[in-house]
Amino acid sequence: MASKRLPGPGGWTGRLVNVLIGLLLMGIAASVSVAATEPAAEDAAIAQSLAEMLRDARAIISNNQAKINDPEIGDKGLTAKVVLDQAMGTYKKNTGVDPATIDPNSRHGRLLRAMMAAIAEVMDANQSTINAKGIGFKAFIPAVFGRLVGESFARLANGEAELKVTAPPELVRNRKARPDAFEEKIIKTKLVEASWPRGQPYSEMTDAKGRAAYRVMVPEYYAASCLTCHGGPKGEMDITGYPKEGASENDLGGVISITLYRAPQAQ
């Protein structure tokens, strides 16, 4: 199976693929013939787009933890529309592309809209939890949000794609987030290695569940704010009731794993 690091920012190859990705994200790729566009470059762009939207929405949940867990406040104002509007704004700021302008009839547009619908679905389903008055910690944390969005996305994508937020096995707290054999292999042999360029995704054309698939794994690293639950002292219980991992800032803390299934004619 062909495998590779997704191109980094340096070198002419990286610049060329970044141009292709930029064209796709801006919708200009529609003017490029399908035959002239590498399927892998298109899949890489779609995967990065999905990961970006998830991260942007999850950051809102992270930044509002104090409000969510405030027992004195009822309505937190974190409706599906508020969260999605903010996430779309951040996406546009980070990519230079308004997600609403991406052709909904394209594969990219379908999957990005499935991701946005999944975000809205999760927020709608958890309003009673978020807005519960008289309750402090509500367990609606970024990790839970990411898992729920991934589950909703897989259903809404209707067999075209899947997304899961996973991590090195020793860091996984929820069995639903455990890496599969492929993910565990790439984490252990690639992403945790000191030689792996920080933040660089890994991609591979392989088989998944008996189907041809392009798989992308986007590494994520602990920020200072993550260490409240995942830092030290190791073994001490955090607010969620799990023992802290003793991690340090910039350690590999998770991976956004995206599977894009190939139609038979695209193989």
Sequence positions of predicted segments:
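Extracytoplasmic c-type cytochrome modules immediately beyond a signal peptide or single-pass transmembrane anchor
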Residues: 34-221, 235-267
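Bacterial N-terminal signal peptides
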Residues: 19-28
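N-terminal secretory signal peptides that target proteins for export/translocation
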Residues: 1-14
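N-terminal signal peptide c-region/cleavage motif recognized by signal peptidases
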Residues: 29-33
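Intrinsic disorder/low-complexity signature
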Residues: 15-18, 40
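The canonical Cys-X-X-Cys-His
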Residues: 222-234
